Amino acid sequence: MEIQGKIAVVTGGASGIGQGLVERFHRDGAEHVVVVDRDEVGARAVAESVGGTGVACDVTDEAAIRSIVDTTERDIGPIGLFVSNAGYVTLGGLEAPVEDLTRMFEVHVLAHLYAARAVIPYMADRGEGYLLNTASAAGLLSQFGSLHYAITKHAAVSLAEWVAITHGHQGIKVSVLCPQAVHSNIVSNSPDAEKMVGTGSDVAGADGTLTAEDVADTVMDALRAERFHVLPHAEVADYVARKGADVDRWIGGMQRWQGSMFPADQHPATWLTGS
Protein backbone atom coordinates (compact mmCIF):
# COMPACT_ATOMS: atom_id res chain seq x y z
CA MET A 1 0.00 0.00 0.00
CA GLU A 2 1.15 3.52 -0.77
CA ILE A 3 -0.19 6.29 1.46
CA GLN A 4 -0.04 8.91 -1.29
CA GLY A 5 -3.52 10.12 -2.16
CA LYS A 6 -5.13 8.16 0.66
CA ILE A 7 -7.33 9.34 3.53
CA ALA A 8 -6.09 8.08 6.90
CA VAL A 9 -7.61 8.08 10.37
CA VAL A 10 -5.20 7.84 13.31
CA THR A 11 -6.37 7.33 16.90
CA GLY A 12 -4.04 8.37 19.67
CA GLY A 13 -2.73 10.83 17.11
CA ALA A 14 -1.98 13.80 19.36
CA SER A 15 1.37 12.53 20.62
CA GLY A 16 3.97 9.79 20.46
CA ILE A 17 3.73 7.08 17.82
CA GLY A 18 0.38 8.39 16.59
CA GLN A 19 1.67 11.90 16.02
CA GLY A 20 4.74 10.53 14.28
CA LEU A 21 2.54 8.57 11.89
CA VAL A 22 0.25 11.53 11.21
CA GLU A 23 3.22 13.70 10.28
CA ARG A 24 4.79 10.97 8.16
CA PHE A 25 1.58 10.22 6.28
CA HIS A 26 1.24 13.92 5.47
CA ARG A 27 4.85 14.17 4.35
CA ASP A 28 4.45 11.12 2.11
CA GLY A 29 1.43 12.53 0.33
CA ALA A 30 -1.70 11.45 2.18
CA GLU A 31 -4.72 13.34 0.86
CA HIS A 32 -6.10 13.99 4.35
CA VAL A 33 -5.43 12.78 7.89
CA VAL A 34 -8.06 12.67 10.63
CA VAL A 35 -6.36 12.95 14.02
CA VAL A 36 -8.34 11.33 16.83
CA ASP A 37 -7.41 11.62 20.50
CA ARG A 38 -9.05 12.08 23.89
CA ASP A 39 -6.92 15.25 24.10
CA GLU A 40 -8.99 17.57 21.92
CA VAL A 41 -6.51 20.45 22.04
CA GLY A 42 -3.66 18.16 21.08
CA ALA A 43 -5.62 16.48 18.30
CA ARG A 44 -6.59 19.80 16.77
CA ALA A 45 -3.05 21.17 17.03
CA VAL A 46 -1.49 18.16 15.30
CA ALA A 47 -4.24 18.15 12.67
CA GLU A 48 -3.77 21.85 11.98
CA SER A 49 -0.05 21.29 11.44
CA VAL A 50 -0.78 18.89 8.57
CA GLY A 51 -3.96 20.45 7.20
CA GLY A 52 -6.07 17.64 8.60
CA THR A 53 -9.05 17.28 10.90
CA GLY A 54 -8.78 16.95 14.68
CA VAL A 55 -11.45 15.10 16.64
CA ALA A 56 -11.82 14.42 20.36
CA CYS A 57 -12.87 10.87 21.11
CA ASP A 58 -12.73 8.16 23.74
CA VAL A 59 -11.79 5.11 21.67
CA THR A 60 -13.74 2.84 24.03
CA ASP A 61 -16.98 4.54 22.94
CA GLU A 62 -18.14 2.48 19.98
CA ALA A 63 -20.79 4.98 18.92
CA ALA A 64 -18.19 7.75 18.82
CA ILE A 65 -15.80 5.67 16.71
CA ARG A 66 -18.59 4.76 14.32
CA SER A 67 -19.58 8.42 14.05
CA ILE A 68 -16.02 9.41 13.14
CA VAL A 69 -15.89 6.74 10.44
CA ASP A 70 -19.31 7.63 9.02
CA THR A 71 -18.57 11.36 9.07
CA THR A 72 -15.19 10.92 7.41
CA GLU A 73 -16.64 8.72 4.67
CA ARG A 74 -19.48 11.18 4.06
CA ASP A 75 -17.73 14.53 4.34
CA ILE A 76 -14.08 13.88 3.48
CA GLY A 77 -13.87 10.72 1.44
CA PRO A 78 -13.11 7.00 1.51
CA ILE A 79 -10.86 5.88 4.36
CA GLY A 80 -7.89 4.05 2.89
CA LEU A 81 -6.08 3.44 6.18
CA PHE A 82 -7.37 3.27 9.74
CA VAL A 83 -4.71 3.31 12.47
CA SER A 84 -5.96 2.12 15.86
CA ASN A 85 -3.21 3.28 18.16
CA ALA A 86 -4.34 4.42 21.62
CA GLY A 87 -2.82 2.67 24.65
CA TYR A 88 -1.27 2.83 28.11
CA VAL A 89 0.55 0.61 30.61
CA THR A 90 0.24 -0.11 34.34
CA LEU A 91 2.03 -2.20 36.95
CA GLY A 92 0.36 -5.22 38.50
CA GLY A 93 0.17 -8.99 38.64
CA LEU A 94 -2.43 -11.49 39.81
CA GLU A 95 -3.30 -9.20 42.72
CA ALA A 96 -4.32 -6.27 40.50
CA PRO A 97 -8.03 -5.37 40.41
CA VAL A 98 -10.03 -7.00 37.65
CA GLU A 99 -11.51 -3.57 36.95
CA ASP A 100 -8.06 -2.43 35.82
CA LEU A 101 -7.89 -5.34 33.38
CA THR A 102 -11.36 -4.54 32.07
CA ARG A 103 -10.44 -0.92 31.38
CA MET A 104 -7.20 -1.87 29.65
CA PHE A 105 -9.00 -4.49 27.58
CA GLU A 106 -11.40 -1.81 26.40
CA VAL A 107 -8.55 0.43 25.22
CA HIS A 108 -6.18 -2.21 23.82
CA VAL A 109 -8.67 -4.65 22.30
CA LEU A 110 -12.25 -3.41 22.08
CA ALA A 111 -11.12 -0.12 20.53
CA HIS A 112 -9.56 -2.13 17.68
CA LEU A 113 -12.72 -4.20 17.35
CA TYR A 114 -14.94 -1.11 17.26
CA ALA A 115 -12.78 0.47 14.57
CA ALA A 116 -12.75 -2.69 12.47
CA ARG A 117 -16.47 -3.23 12.48
CA ALA A 118 -17.14 0.43 11.71
CA VAL A 119 -14.74 0.78 8.79
CA ILE A 120 -14.52 -2.69 7.22
CA PRO A 121 -18.01 -2.58 5.63
CA TYR A 122 -16.99 0.56 3.71
CA MET A 123 -13.64 -0.94 2.72
CA ALA A 124 -15.10 -4.31 1.74
CA ASP A 125 -17.67 -2.59 -0.45
CA ARG A 126 -14.79 -0.94 -2.32
CA GLY A 127 -12.73 -4.13 -2.37
CA GLU A 128 -9.76 -2.56 -0.60
CA GLY A 129 -8.65 -1.01 2.67
CA TYR A 130 -5.96 -1.21 5.31
CA LEU A 131 -5.99 -1.52 9.10
CA LEU A 132 -2.88 -0.83 11.17
CA ASN A 133 -3.32 -1.80 14.82
CA THR A 134 -0.76 -0.86 17.44
CA ALA A 135 -0.04 -3.69 19.86
CA SER A 136 3.40 -4.26 21.39
CA ALA A 137 6.30 -6.68 21.47
CA ALA A 138 4.60 -7.72 24.72
CA GLY A 139 1.81 -9.11 22.56
CA LEU A 140 4.26 -11.52 20.95
CA LEU A 141 6.36 -12.19 24.05
CA SER A 142 5.29 -10.94 27.51
CA GLN A 143 5.69 -7.96 29.85
CA PHE A 144 7.49 -8.17 33.18
CA GLY A 145 5.49 -6.56 35.97
CA SER A 146 2.29 -5.97 34.01
CA LEU A 147 -0.07 -8.92 33.68
CA HIS A 148 -2.85 -6.77 32.23
CA TYR A 149 -0.58 -5.30 29.54
CA ALA A 150 0.68 -8.74 28.50
CA ILE A 151 -2.84 -10.18 28.34
CA THR A 152 -4.41 -7.33 26.39
CA LYS A 153 -1.56 -6.92 23.93
CA HIS A 154 -1.68 -10.64 23.14
CA ALA A 155 -5.40 -10.26 22.57
CA ALA A 156 -4.77 -7.29 20.28
CA VAL A 157 -2.40 -9.34 18.14
CA SER A 158 -4.90 -12.21 18.02
CA LEU A 159 -7.70 -9.87 16.95
CA ALA A 160 -5.55 -8.50 14.13
CA GLU A 161 -4.70 -12.03 12.99
CA TRP A 162 -8.38 -12.98 12.96
CA VAL A 163 -9.37 -9.95 10.92
CA ALA A 164 -6.57 -10.57 8.42
CA ILE A 165 -7.60 -14.22 8.02
CA THR A 166 -11.33 -13.57 7.83
CA HIS A 167 -11.51 -10.43 5.69
CA GLY A 168 -8.44 -10.79 3.49
CA HIS A 169 -10.46 -12.13 0.56
CA GLN A 170 -12.46 -8.87 0.62
CA GLY A 171 -9.32 -6.84 -0.04
CA ILE A 172 -8.73 -5.91 3.60
CA LYS A 173 -5.06 -5.75 4.56
CA VAL A 174 -3.95 -5.77 8.19
CA SER A 175 -0.68 -4.98 9.94
CA VAL A 176 0.04 -5.10 13.66
CA LEU A 177 2.68 -2.78 15.11
CA CYS A 178 4.73 -4.45 17.87
CA PRO A 179 7.46 -2.13 19.16
CA GLN A 180 9.47 -2.33 22.33
CA ALA A 181 10.35 0.99 24.00
CA VAL A 182 9.50 4.19 22.15
CA HIS A 183 9.82 7.80 23.31
CA SER A 184 6.16 8.58 23.98
CA ASN A 185 3.76 9.36 26.80
CA ILE A 186 2.57 5.76 27.27
CA VAL A 187 4.26 5.61 30.68
CA SER A 188 3.49 9.18 31.73
CA ASN A 189 -0.18 8.50 30.94
CA SER A 190 -0.14 5.55 33.33
CA PRO A 191 -1.62 5.84 36.82
CA ASP A 192 1.53 3.98 37.92
CA ALA A 193 3.97 6.30 36.14
CA GLU A 194 6.10 7.17 39.17
CA LYS A 195 6.30 3.55 40.34
CA MET A 196 7.40 2.31 36.91
CA VAL A 197 10.58 4.36 36.68
CA GLY A 198 13.65 2.25 37.32
CA THR A 199 11.77 -1.02 37.83
CA GLY A 200 12.04 -4.27 35.92
CA SER A 201 8.94 -3.27 34.00
CA ASP A 202 11.15 -1.05 31.84
CA VAL A 203 12.73 -4.14 30.24
CA ALA A 204 11.23 -3.03 26.92
CA GLY A 205 14.10 -0.55 26.67
CA ALA A 206 16.76 -3.27 26.76
CA ASP A 207 17.22 -3.07 22.99
CA GLY A 208 17.12 0.71 22.87
CA THR A 209 14.39 3.33 22.90
CA LEU A 210 13.31 4.49 19.47
CA THR A 211 11.80 7.79 18.41
CA ALA A 212 8.35 8.07 16.89
CA GLU A 213 10.09 8.94 13.63
CA ASP A 214 12.04 5.66 13.75
CA VAL A 215 8.78 3.78 14.21
CA ALA A 216 7.17 5.66 11.33
CA ASP A 217 10.03 4.61 9.04
CA THR A 218 9.40 0.95 9.86
CA VAL A 219 5.65 1.35 9.48
CA MET A 220 5.95 2.86 6.01
CA ASP A 221 8.21 0.02 4.86
CA ALA A 222 5.74 -2.54 6.24
CA LEU A 223 2.73 -0.85 4.62
CA ARG A 224 4.44 -0.84 1.24
CA ALA A 225 5.29 -4.53 1.61
CA GLU A 226 1.86 -5.27 3.16
CA ARG A 227 3.64 -7.14 5.93
CA PHE A 228 1.58 -8.30 8.93
CA HIS A 229 4.17 -7.94 11.68
CA VAL A 230 5.65 -4.45 11.99
CA LEU A 231 8.74 -4.76 14.20
CA PRO A 232 10.65 -1.50 14.72
CA HIS A 233 13.08 -3.36 16.99
CA ALA A 234 14.60 -6.00 14.70
CA GLU A 235 15.60 -8.12 17.70
CA VAL A 236 11.96 -8.97 18.36
CA ALA A 237 11.81 -11.24 15.31
CA ASP A 238 14.63 -13.32 16.77
CA TYR A 239 12.96 -13.49 20.18
CA VAL A 240 9.70 -14.67 18.60
CA ALA A 241 11.57 -17.31 16.61
CA ARG A 242 13.27 -18.59 19.76
CA LYS A 243 9.94 -18.76 21.56
CA GLY A 244 8.38 -20.71 18.71
CA ALA A 245 11.30 -23.12 18.47
CA ASP A 246 11.30 -24.11 22.17
CA VAL A 247 8.72 -22.43 24.37
CA ASP A 248 9.84 -24.25 27.53
CA ARG A 249 13.39 -23.01 27.11
CA TRP A 250 12.05 -19.52 26.39
CA ILE A 251 9.96 -19.49 29.58
CA GLY A 252 12.99 -20.59 31.60
CA GLY A 253 15.04 -17.80 30.10
CA MET A 254 12.32 -15.25 30.81
CA GLN A 255 12.11 -16.45 34.42
CA ARG A 256 15.83 -15.88 34.88
CA TRP A 257 15.72 -12.51 33.13
CA GLN A 258 12.82 -11.29 35.23
CA GLY A 259 14.63 -12.42 38.38
CA SER A 260 17.62 -10.30 37.39
CA MET A 261 15.46 -7.23 36.73
CA PHE A 262 13.70 -6.99 40.10
CA PRO A 263 15.15 -6.99 43.64
CA ALA A 264 13.99 -10.15 45.42
CA ASP A 265 11.63 -8.23 47.71
CA GLN A 266 10.04 -6.45 44.72
CA HIS A 267 9.61 -9.45 42.42
CA PRO A 268 6.12 -9.47 40.85
CA ALA A 269 5.34 -12.79 42.55
CA THR A 270 5.58 -11.05 45.94
CA TRP A 271 2.82 -8.62 45.00
CA LEU A 272 0.36 -11.48 45.49
CA THR A 273 2.06 -13.80 47.99
CA GLY A 274 4.14 -11.34 50.03
CA SER A 275 7.33 -13.35 49.65
Predicted regions and their residues:
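Active-site-adjacent segment of SDR/Rossmann-fold oxidoreductases
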Residues: D28, L141, W162-K173
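Active-site helix of classical SDR
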Residues: A116, T152
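Conserved mid-core segment of classical short-chain dehydrogenase/reductases
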Residues: R66, Y88-T102, G145-H148
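Conserved glycine-rich Rossmann-like NAD(P)H-binding loop of the short-chain dehydrogenase/reductase
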Residues: A30-A45
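The beta1-alpha1 cofactor-binding region of Rossmann-like NAD(H)/NADP(H)-dependent oxidoreductases
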Residues: E40-V41, C57-S67, V98
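SDR active-site lid
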Residues: T166-A234
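Residue(s) in the substrate-gating loop at a strand-loop-helix junction
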Residues: S136
